[in-house]
Structure formats: C-alpha cells, structure tokens
C-alpha cells in the first residue's frame, strides 16, 4: 500500500522531507501557510544561501539539550550527501574555505532546483493553508486548516521556529507539537545582534571592522570568544562574531549580566602595535593623536577610543607620553561594552530551544509515543553556528524524516 505523507511547511527541511518521502514511494502533499514556498530560504546567507559547511567536526557543532541527537542525524545524511543530492538536481556549487554556496551565488537557484524536483515527483503543494489543528482519527492523522481537513498516514512537522515571522515562521508549530503531547524548550533568539549601553553608539552606526569579541559573564568570567567582522549599530554590536556568541546571552537567566570585550587589534601583538604607535608619534609631533590612529582604526572609532583612553581629541603627538600610548593600546585591545540583551525574534536568524528531542528517535525522526508523527528542521531543539550548519541540519533531518515517514 502506498503511504500518504503530509509535510507541514515548505521551507528547507520541508522540501527535503517531501522529496525524500516521494523518492521512497510515498504520495506526498505539502501544506504551506505562506503564499509561496521557501521564503526564508531565499534570504539565507544574505540571499546567497550557504548550503552547507565542510567542517570535519560539523556534526559536533550543534547546541541544544541533546547535541548527540543532532550528531546522529547529521551522520546519516552528512554534507557529502547534501552535495551529491544538489548536484543530482543540476545545481553547481562552489567551496569557499569549507563554506559551500550555489555557483550562481543566488539562493533562488537552490529553491528553484528543489521546486523543479517537487514538480517532477508530482508532489502536491497547497499554499496559503495554515494548519489550525492536528489529531488522530480512525488510524490516520487529520490535519485541519481553515478550508479543509487533510487525512494522511504520516505527518511531518517542518513548521519552522519563531524567528523571522515575516517569512512564515511564526512559532505555531510549537503549539501543534504540544497538542500531540510533546514538550517544548522555551525558544530564545540565536544568531542575533547584541544590545549594549553607550551614548556613543549612535555615532558608530554602520562602522565595520575586524575584531575579536569575548563574551564575559559578570564582566570578568570568559564564556566564549569569536573573531570576524564586527558591525557597530545604534543599539549595540552585530556581525558574525557577535551572532555566534548571542545564544549564551539569550538563553541565560534574566538575572545574569554580560559584557563584551572587543580586541580591535587582533591578530597583532602588543609589541607590534606599540612599535608602530611610538614610531608614528615621533614622526608626527605636530599632528593630532588621531593622525597616528588613522591607519589602525576606522575614522569614526578614533574619537571614541581617545575618550575612553583619556586622551583629549586636540592633543598633539608631542604630548603623547608612554602612559598615554599604553592607554591607547589597552583601550583598543580591551574595549568594554555592557550588554543589556539581544534583538528579538523579528531580527534573529535562528532560535535556540524548540521541541524536546527526548521524545523522538534520532534514527527516524519519529515521535516514539505517537506513531506516524515526524519532525524536522528549526522546530526542534537544535541550533548551530553561522556558516551553513543550520541548513545542513534542515537537509539532514528532513531527509531522515521523509525517508522513514514513507516506509
């Protein structure tokens, strides 16, 4: 007997689940709440879609209550199989130091090859169909929308998380999972900018620079450190290095306090920077101190650094003594910001938290206590770093769920 599989959600994991189920012989229907499929996929990687990552330790890079679960799922459908899958759909890819993108550099190419395969496999796609209720009746799953009740043998929930609700991820999948008896770890924004104190921040909005950002608990205890592009905003700091650290803040208790220590000189040593500062100050005696810093820092950062270091904006290099040079070095090396929180679900790229994995089988993605109910993607309590890790989770979990839902 041919199984009828219904997939809730036409995002990355949902499209993969539907294709895997159809290739395994099932009749497949996708229900999508939005007016077109793959809206979030189109904006991933700033519209370029970082498909996966060839990091050899990728399967161990995920967060959540049970990282071993994610590792087990990823190993069933690793990045190598993801590349084979997309190459088989006619998508050329390019590898940039392990970060894999479509050769066209366009997320739309990824979505189009997926939708072409959906059409080839005669998978039905019902758009603008928001699921209101799921329930078991007469040995089948019933999926109720405002317009229809769809019966199916297996149901795969790929409804997404709460992040970027404008793309369709409004968090409604958590309620559907809860209605089936599953627990949900409270979602928090992840891969998101940090909110910080500082009146000077408005003057730095839009400034980008290379930096190492260290997250401190209580201003003293290092939690984690990341290096990369830092973007200053009117409300705090952003950029990939900040995104990687943000989950530690959003997942912490409200009573915990954090600070960011920013090294604006990474990877240069103290001796290298001191030598340059001394040499340039000696050569530019009649110039303002800012002249020495222009080859080191973005222009808008210079007055902020000088103020933090206690050096008047109008001071000339002739007045720059060893103590002042040390103050400049220290301020650039350990610029402190008090963190007040993170941006919200509208802004974050991912959620930490989600459906509790302990109720699922990592071999099949099926709920152990509720037969025929499967899960994949962001809805689950799995989140990874920037760089293709989270799309790989979508491909892997979607593939495993789809294949087993069809059996």
Regions found by a protein language model. Name each.
Residues 46-97:
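Glycine-rich active-site loop/strand segments that organize a redox cofactor
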Residues 76-154:
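Feature captures the FAD/FMN-dependent oxidoreductase FAD-binding
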Residues 6-8, 31, 131, 150-166, ...:
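Short hydrophobic core segments
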Residues 3-30, 401-406:
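N-terminal Rossmann-like FAD-binding beta1-loop-alpha1 element of flavoenzymes
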Residues 35-37, 42-43, 51-58, 92, ...:
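An anion/pyrophosphate-binding glycine-rich loop and adjacent beta-alpha core
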Residues 22-46:
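Glycine-rich FAD pyrophosphate-binding loop
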Residues 154-200:
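Glycine-rich loop(s) and the adjacent beta-strand/alpha-helix scaffold that form part
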Residues 127, 303-383:
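A glycine-rich dinucleotide-binding beta-alpha-beta segment and adjacent secondary-structure elements
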């Amino acid at each position: 007997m041919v199984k009828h599989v219904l997939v809730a959600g036409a995002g990355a994991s949902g499209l993969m689940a539907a294709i895997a189920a159809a290739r395994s012989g099932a009749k497949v229907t996708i229900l999508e709440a939005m007016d077109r499929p793959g809206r979030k996929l189109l904006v991933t990687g700033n519209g370029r879609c970082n498909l996966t990552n060839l990091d050899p330790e990728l399967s161990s890079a995920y967060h959540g209550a049970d990282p071993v679960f994610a590792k087990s799922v990823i190993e069933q459908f690793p990045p190598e199989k993801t590349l084979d899958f997309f190459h088989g759909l006619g998508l050329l890819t390019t590898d940039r130091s392990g970060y894999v993108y479509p050769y066209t550099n366009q997320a739309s190419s990824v979505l189009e090859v997926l939708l072409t395969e959906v059409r080839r496999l005669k998978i039905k796609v019902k758009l603008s169909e928001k699921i209101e209720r799921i329930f078991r009746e007469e040995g089948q799953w019933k999926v109720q929308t405002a317009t229809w009740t769809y019966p199916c043998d297996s149901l795969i929930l790929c409804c997404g998380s709460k992040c970027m609700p404008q793309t369709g991820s409004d968090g409604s999948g958590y309620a559907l999972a809860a209605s089936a008896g599953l627990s949900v770890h409270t979602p928090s924004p992840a891969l998101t900018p940090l909110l910080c104190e500082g009146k000077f921040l408005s003057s730095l909005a839009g400034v980008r620079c290379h930096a190492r950002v260290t997250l401190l608990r209580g201003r003293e205890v290092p939690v984690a450190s990341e290096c990369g592009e830092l973007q200053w905003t009117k409300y705090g700091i952003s950029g990939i290095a900040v995104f990687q650290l943000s989950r530690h803040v959003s997942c912490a208790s409200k009573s915990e306090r954090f600070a960011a220590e920013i090294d604006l000189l990474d990877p240069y040593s103290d001796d290298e920077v001191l030598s340059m500062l001394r040499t340039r100050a000696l050569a530019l005696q009649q110039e303002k101190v800012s002249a020495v810093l222009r080859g080191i820092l973005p222009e808008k950062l210079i007055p902020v650094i000088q103020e933090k270091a206690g050096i008047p904006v109008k001071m000339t290099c002739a007045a720059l003594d060893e103590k002042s040079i040390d103050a400049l070095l220290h301020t650039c090396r350990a610029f402190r910001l008090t963190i007040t929180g993170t941006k919200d679900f509208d802004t974050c790229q991912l959620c930490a938290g989600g459906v509790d994995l302990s109720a699922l089988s990592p071999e099949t993605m099926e709920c152990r206590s509720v037969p025929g109910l499967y899960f994949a993607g962001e809805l689950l309590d799995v989140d990874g770093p920037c760089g293709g890790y989270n799309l790989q989770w979508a491909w892997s979990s979607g593939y495993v769920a789809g294949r087993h839902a069809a059996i």
